[in-house]
């Protein structure tokens, strides 16, 4: 029915590839493309005999627009699923524009030399995508992605007005290493060492990194420390959820992770600025990435569960109301199914679902969109079908926040 070009061959890409191959009625053909073709060939070798989806592979440098254009013109995909690096989003969008190919990603663009991510660069493509008659679906991972769909679903079915949204991202997994990141180390460490922020009463409130803390008792996981971070979906939800008064994002971290991160930051290893070493320039955080375990290798050794969702407060039929919509994912179950830990799984499954929404016409219209701008119902049904079942808890525990240094 459709041809998908999947750009990337890391942990999330592996999940997208597996799920597209499970969904061969929709994805009849896929091309896996990466800078390192041998990684793509490995996926093909593993899966081709287990699926009706026809798999091809290609080498491509996602920083090189002419290379991307040449590949798209040769393969003629209906959709491009971008699970490469966020630095490469705009290059891939440029190629999609030139070749009139629909586009889906899981994380918004950020410049490689600055630890700052926001949607303005991709939203600026809206008119060009409209004129080209193609769809760009931004942020169809879990957070951003499913969390935005949860917001649209809550707005449609549970509230007349949503007043507050707290997005909670809990990883209760244990990989056994003193320090490792569950997705791209460079992206992860840049994100958590940056200033935090939240949306309140129509404007941004900025915080110091890890300044605000909470402890939350997560269903099926238990009590975890969590910290307020800046996260990209706050920006789009503030625009797309009318009347919302406050949006915050929290992520859980263990003490070992925070101690290691602070030490690395103190000695300059999280810097994005190049330094001279033995006659060549290196970027400290990129060098650190080379030393840390590859997130794709964590699957077999990670145990425990994730709990990711949104706590909403608001009004329905004149009465105050609160709910928690969430998913729980088991690391070992994910590994049994697609040889991945749950962090990659919870990002890769929604990327496939978002792409399916576009190619089947359910979420297809010209322009650049965030997930919460579409009807959430078919996406929510697909989550249950494809491995990320969700639950709704009425009157959940609400989040209480304090300054981390006041513990």
Question: Where on the chain are the PLM-derived regions?
Answer:
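N-terminal Rossmann-fold NAD(P) dinucleotide-binding loop
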Residues: 13-17
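ADP-ribose/adenylate-binding Rossmann-like module
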Residues: 83-86, 95-118
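C-terminal catalytic/substrate-binding lobe primarily of soluble NAD(P)-dependent oxidoreductases
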Residues: 156-407
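Conserved N-terminal Rossmann-fold NAD(P)-binding element of oxidoreductases
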Residues: 4-11
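Rossmann-fold cofactor-recognition segment
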Residues: 49-64
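Helix N-cap at the beta1-alpha1 junction of Rossmann-like dinucleotide-binding domains, i.e.
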Residues: 36-39
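Rossmann-fold NAD(P)-binding glycine/threonine-rich loop
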Residues: 107-135
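Conserved Rossmann-fold cofactor-binding substructure of NAD(P)-dependent oxidoreductases
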Residues: 61-77, 88
